[in-house]
A protein has these predicted regions:
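Acidic, low-complexity intrinsically disordered regions
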Residues: 1-233
Length: 233
């Protein structure tokens, strides 16, 4: 991958967010106890905010990338979580909308070493969701179609390829392991002149491991959580 991300060679960020019932389970995140759904919503909103700010220049927000956020939950429900329900929007369109804000409580270390809680405003485009099943396969098919449409455009032919993040805590309820691998392979087979689409799975787990594992090698991926093992093998 060598292509720089510019207005003439934009890229795309596509997020698939698990909103199934198990996302109501509590975890420790940033020093506070919250549900997995709340943690994922916070991470996603922070990422969207950072993407907007990184594209901001003196003349406004420049379209360095397009953004998609697909949620999957409920009774095989797959839908866009972006305001307005569009599958894919340029970053300037997201920035142009009034940003929903909620109050977030964070820990703040005082000069004497003690910890105090502080309330700060935080972006809230994405709301926490935890209900029903995990139609991951259908969500990834939706992601595949979004990525296929994006990479097929002549204007994107030489661009840095889309980056896909799939954030989940469990196994798909709408397909078997082989079907899941197949749709993932279909996503990774898409690309531009610069290279193939990057698919990054992020597994959210409570108490399975003492430390986060980033880009696991084969022996690291085979840890006790069988759901995570499938995502990384």
């Amino acid at each position: 991958y060598t292509q720089s991300i510019t207005r003439n060679h934009r890229t795309a960020f596509i997020l698939a967010i698990d909103g199934s019932g198990s996302m109501a389970e509590s975890i420790l995140f940033r020093g506070r106890c919250m549900t997995k759904a709340e943690a994922v919503a916070t991470i996603t909103n922070d990422l969207l905010f950072e993407l907007v700010e990184r594209a901001r220049r003196s003349d406004g927000v420049r379209d360095y990338y397009d953004i998609a956020v697909v949620g999957y939950s409920g009774d095989d429900e797959v839908r866009s979580l972006l305001p307005g329900g569009e599958d894919l929007v340029p970053v300037s369109a997201l920035a142009a909308q009034e940003m929903p804000v909620h109050t977030e409580v964070i820990e703040h270390r005082l000069p004497d070493g003690s910890i105090a809680l502080r309330e700060i405003p935080a972006p809230a485009w994405i709301k926490p969701l935890s209900a029903g099943q995990t139609p991951m396969c259908e969500a990834l098919r939706r992601v595949r179609d979004i990525a296929a449409g994006w990479t097929s455009r002549t204007a994107n032919a030489e661009s840095f390829p889309p980056v896909v993040f799939n954030i989940t805590d469990g196994e798909a309820t709408d397909c078997d392991n082989e079907e899941l691998r197949t749709v993932c392979d279909q996503i990774k087979a898409l690309g531009t002149v610069d290279g193939n689409v990057l698919l990054i799975n992020i597994h959210i787990a409570a108490g399975d491991t003492e430390r986060p594992v980033f880009f696991p090698e084969a022996h690291e991926a085979r840890y006790t959580n069988r759901y995570a093992s499938l995502l990384y093998l």
